[in-house]
Swiss-Prot record:
ATP binds at residues 40-47. The keyword Transmembrane does not apply. Residues 5-240 form the ABC transporter domain. Forms a stable energy-coupling factor (ECF) transporter complex composed of 2 membrane-embedded substrate-binding proteins (S component), 2 ATP-binding proteins (A component) and 2 transmembrane proteins (T component). It is found in: Cell membrane. GO terms for cellular component: ATP-binding cassette (ABC) transporter complex. Belongs to the ABC transporter superfamily. Energy-coupling factor EcfA family. This is Energy-coupling factor transporter ATP-binding protein EcfA. Its main location: membrane. It comes from Pediococcus pentosaceus (strain ATCC 25745 / CCUG 21536 / LMG 10740 / 183-1w). It is a peripheral membrane protein. Pfam families: ABC_tran.
């Protein structure tokens, strides 16, 4: 297994928080090229963890290794070159007067030549399907479109890791669906590691691996179908059951008993129901 991130015994405590720790001796590994969702209720420590990995927050104890580099004051900028972060509020991410200017901003800081910069900007805007909006101002865009521009800005710098810090939580259902599908496309087409910080179980179900945080500690990790099939853990952490599990349980309450292995498999449960209706 080739890990791109290793976190060992990470502890973080906010000032004036007493004995409460936002992160309490957290250790985890993230495989290169994978999509990992870090889930938990508000205050569970998931955003603190993401921002610690990117060097935006100085933790109290522990070690963070990103692609073979130990995070420190001397290496933080080397690590940030490898990571692109997309935050919750798209309005807080715009720094350019237009879409094109915003995507070019990071490239200008890297000293990229103008001709090459234009090619990169056009290419990434096409990838996120925003090439027809490059002269638009931020206030002329929807929330989902702004997040697409933020993703384009991240892709322009060719990161090895993309961290989505609650990046879909302020979007309407359609916008959320479009952004998650876009990230899924980018993940499938490129060797990019994706870390999604979320409390949206349906979003986390698309990932390869799920880590559940509760009160600063990891309480469960594994494949999404395994993790979200644990009703006791979901109750403890205040997370919702996936839609498929809700449907399965509702069928059982009505005296309809699908095979238990279909509880976390939406496509197979749908097919089973279709076959059941055809026999009726």
């Amino acid at each position: 297994m080739n890990n791109i991130i290793d976190v060992k015994n990470l502890t973080y405590k906010y000032a004036n928080s007493g004995d409460k720790k936002a992160l309490d001796n957290v250790s985890l590994s993230i495989e290169k090229g994978s999509w990992t969702s870090i889930v938990g209720h508000n205050g569970s420590g998931k955003s603190t963890l993401a921002r610690s990995i990117d060097g935006l927050m100085s933790y109290n104890e522990g070690v963070i290794n990103v692609d073979g580099i130990i995070l420190s004051d001397d290496t933080v900028w080397d690590i940030r070159k490898k990571i692109g972060m997309i935050f919750q509020n798209p309005d807080n991410q715009f720094v350019g007067a237009t879409v094109e200017d915003d995507v070019a901003f990071g490239l200008e800081n890297l000293g990229i030549e103008t001709d090459k910069m234009h090619k990169i900007v056009n290419n990434v805007l096409k990838k996120v399907r925003m090439e027809d909006f490059k002269e638009r101002q931020p206030d002329q865009l929807s929330g989902g479109q702004k997040q697409r521009v933020a993703i384009a800005g991240v892709l322009a710098s060719k990161p090895e890791i993309i961290i989505l810090d609650e990046a879909t939580s302020m979007l309407d259902p359609q916008g959320r669906y479009e952004i998650i599908n876009l990230i899924n496309e980018i993940h499938q087409e490129n060797d990019i590691t994706v870390i999604s910080i979320t409390h949206d179980v349906s979003e986390a179900m698309l990932s390869d691996h799920v880590i559940v945080l509760n009160d600063g500690k990891i309480v469960e990790s594994g494949a999404p179908k395994k993790v979200f099939n644990d009703d006791e853990m979901l109750k403890l952490t205040g997370l919702e059951k996936p839609f498929n599990a809700h449907l399965f349980d509702a069928l059982v309450e009505q005296g309809i008993h699908p095979p238990v292995e279909l509880r976390m498999d939406e496509n197979d449960l749908e097919e089973w129901l279709c076959q059941l209706l055809l026999k009726a």
